[in-house]
Amino acid sequence: MSSGMDWLQVESLDLEAQGVAHRADGKVVFIEGALPGETVQVQVSRRKNQWEQGVLSALARESSQRVRPGCPHFGLHAGACGGCKMQHLHPAAQVAVKQRVLEDNLWHLGKVKPERLLRPIHGPAWGYRWRARLSVRYVPKKGVVLVGFHERKSRYVADMLECPVLPAKVSAMLPALRELIGAMEQRDRLPQIELAAGDEVIALVLRHLEPLSAGDAARLRAFGAEHGVQWWLQPKGPETVHRLDEGGPQLAYSLPEYGVTMPFKPTDFTQVNPQINRVLVDRAVRLLAPQPHERIVDWFCGLGNFTLPLARRAAAVHGIEGSETLVQRARENAAANGLAANTSFAARNLFEMSADELMTSGAADAWLVDPPREGAFALAKSLAELRGREGWTPPRRIVYVSCNPATLARDAGLIVHLAGFRCVAAGVVNMFPHTAHVESIAVFERSEAALSPRPVGEAAPELAAEPAPDAVA
């Protein structure tokens, strides 16, 4: 039996940014804090027949990619924040790891190999997170209020005085937020503050379990005036979110290259990283290459993040989204940006899309697909079922933006092997630096095979089935 104090050679990182090594007997060891190429010892916390898990305890050979973390709350120490997992790895190396995760998932789960790799999309590693959900905890025994992310592998809130992945103004505001909550009458009934920042406005959504007193409302107003933030309140579910006081500037972000401004509410889905979102939108539009005479369908369109820029280039864009509320907001955004004439929107459950429904709603020259983590299985499956059907012409190109490499790989397998498309390109988007989250973009082009039925008896590779498994490390 191997000793927990054996020196191990770290081979790779898994999806949780843990180092992966093997003992002499072949057992896999997952090591938090270790990097590929390092020789380490591990303090084992869990043991199973085939694997072990633990924390880096000693380091004999250090990776050249190891860097000093940029936040004092990051690390393996007790009480460390669990919001980031990769601050000890050079940002360029983080991108390389995510690219490998994408390629491995496409191949192992979808049996798909892109014809070329896209240049990774990346940007500033700090101050990028314009959306965040911060937990709040009043600790009576210590007489303090904690505001921040949870501790690593814990339900407790980390004792944070700064957070460099948040906008600098918000990071610097954390101590003042703690003081504010500590002074409020309802301090033990305020579990969460959600950040939603736009180009000009920083909105904070306060979740409160009891009605706020007049005194507490006055404290919020004074804080907002001093720190330049807009308060929203959430007494119950997301549908109850409302402004503390009406008036003032509107929460919005812009896509300057396309002359688009997108008003939104704090509860609406918007990308965490606005700088990367601008680059991503431009990359997606250029890859889709809509022509002035073409019709585009934007699946999972949300507020119109891709719909409206595409409408600047194409004859018509039809956005489809599961939420009627978001569809209405997308219509309003299209009208506000002068794009109502060549955009249309519809609410539809895209997780139950049948081939017949796709036949009537999916006819277009090109598709933009931007699903949530669950992916677009029903859409990809129906596309495959329509292959060769009389009266159906599949889109010439599909650009698929993904926030889960496992479901992208599953759907890519259907699109390539059963629907008859080629995966001509794929690449990563580092939307969340210092985390293990992998965002990506893939491009599929219609081949001649997509226009004819799949040959009877043609063998298909064994593909990942619905629901998708966890991503491959």
UniProtKB/Swiss-Prot annotation:
Pfam families xref list: TRAM (PF01938), tRNA_U5-meth_tr (PF05958)
GO biological process, one term: rRNA base methylation
Xref: SUPFAM superfamilies: Nucleic acid-binding proteins, S-adenosyl-L-methionine-dependent methyltransferases
Keyword terms of this UniProt record: 4Fe-4S, Iron, Iron-sulfur, Metal-binding, Methyltransferase, rRNA processing, S-adenosyl-L-methionine, Transferase
Binding-site residues for S-adenosyl-L-methionine, renumbered to this chain: 271, 300, 305, 321, 349, 370
Protein name according to UniProt: 23S rRNA (uracil(1939)-C(5))-methyltransferase RlmD
Record-linked PANTHER family: 23S RRNA (URACIL(1939)-C(5))-METHYLTRANSFERASE RLMD, RNA M5U METHYLTRANSFERASE
Residue ranges constituting the TRAM domain according to the UniProt record: 1-58
